Amino acid sequence: HMSMDLWIFDVGRGLCVAIRSPNGYLCVIDCGRSDDFSPIEWLATQEWTRHKNYKLAKLIITHPHVDHIADIETVTNKLKPFMILRRKDLDWGKVISGGSDQTTVMKHFMKNYMPPEYNSTVSDADKPDWGDGFVLSSYCLGESKAAEISGTDSAYVNNTSYVTIITYQNYRIALPGDIESEGMAALLQESQRLCSAINS
């Protein structure tokens, strides 16, 4: 009997979601943590179907706010991903305008998960077969559109969030990162594919 498992961890601020696909592969969306609990450390102790010997088949970073990448060093040390989805095209002046570039978390993220790291496209043949018709689709606003509609640097980063739709059997699960209402409205307006994924 095939099934999917979904964990939404209570990490206070930020986010950490884990998905076990029907074929047993692990996908993690964001790597937040609380003061006393690291979902990444726990996930690293569990059994998963390995993809090319990686326990973590895919890591999605919705947007680079520190609370969404708080546990990135643990990812590197204990649960390094085979592939990562993250924005490479952002205005980094805005991303770090609050001084977050001074944090070890942001420094580590930029050094280990930005080009030239993880910078080649993964071919379809090299992607995991999640199994049983399970589909993971991510959508985002173009950088200039996010800049245009956002009143503050923080809103800009939020509005660059990947919105991920999990489609499995009769379920549609939307994980929108921290996209703000004006960002979601703009994304729905410009992405027919996102509308279809939600409504199909």
Where are these regions (language model features)?
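Metal-dependent catalytic neighborhoods of phosphoester/phosphodiester hydrolases
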Residues: 69-79, 94-106
